[in-house]
Amino acid sequence: MARLSEAEITEHLAQRPDWSLENNNEIVRTFRLANFPAAIAFVTHVAFLAEAAGHHPDIDIRYNRVRIALTTHDAGGLTEKDFALAAAIDEILG
């Protein structure tokens, strides 16, 4: 899959305002859940989405906060896959 241009990344980020660009090659969002079990349940849901998409995020859990970072390693940056998975993750919590 082709790496996105800066203009394409900017366009996609406008549609995903809760996500931010870091290091010019990944998008990141931190989710705040009710408690640790809710955070684990959320991560489990993300894991099933990621596995189905064949695209696996970096996930960091800190009690009730979950940080998710998306990039396409084999493309060396962001692709449509990252923004598609970000959209699917956003839908988990409505």
UniProtKB/Swiss-Prot annotation:
Q: What does the sequence similarity comment in the record state about its family?
A: Belongs to the pterin-4-alpha-carbinolamine dehydratase family.
- Do you know which InterPro entries this protein is assigned to? PCD_sf, Pterin_deHydtase
Report the EC code(s) recorded for this entry. 4.2.1.96
Instruction: List the lineage, top down.
Output: Bacteria, Bacillati, Chloroflexota, Chloroflexia, Chloroflexales
* Protein's recorded name: Putative pterin-4-alpha-carbinolamine dehydratase
Q: Supply the enzyme class, top level.
A: lyase
Q: Which CDD domains match?
A: PCD_DCoH
Alphabetical GO biological process terms: tetrahydrobiopterin biosynthetic process
Q: Which organism is it from?
A: Chloroflexus aggregans (strain MD-66 / DSM 9485)
Q: Does the keyword Lyase apply?
A: yes
* Reactions catalysed according to its record: (4aS,6R)-4a-hydroxy-L-erythro-5,6,7,8-tetrahydrobiopterin = (6R)-L-erythro-6,7-dihydrobiopterin + H2O
Q: Which UniProt keywords apply?
A: Lyase
Alphabetically, the GO molecular function entries are: 4-alpha-hydroxytetrahydrobiopterin dehydratase activity
Source organism's superkingdom?
Answer: Bacteria
Task: Name any one Pfam family assigned in the record.
Answer: Pterin_4a
NCBIfam families named in the record = PRK00823.1-2 (NF002017)
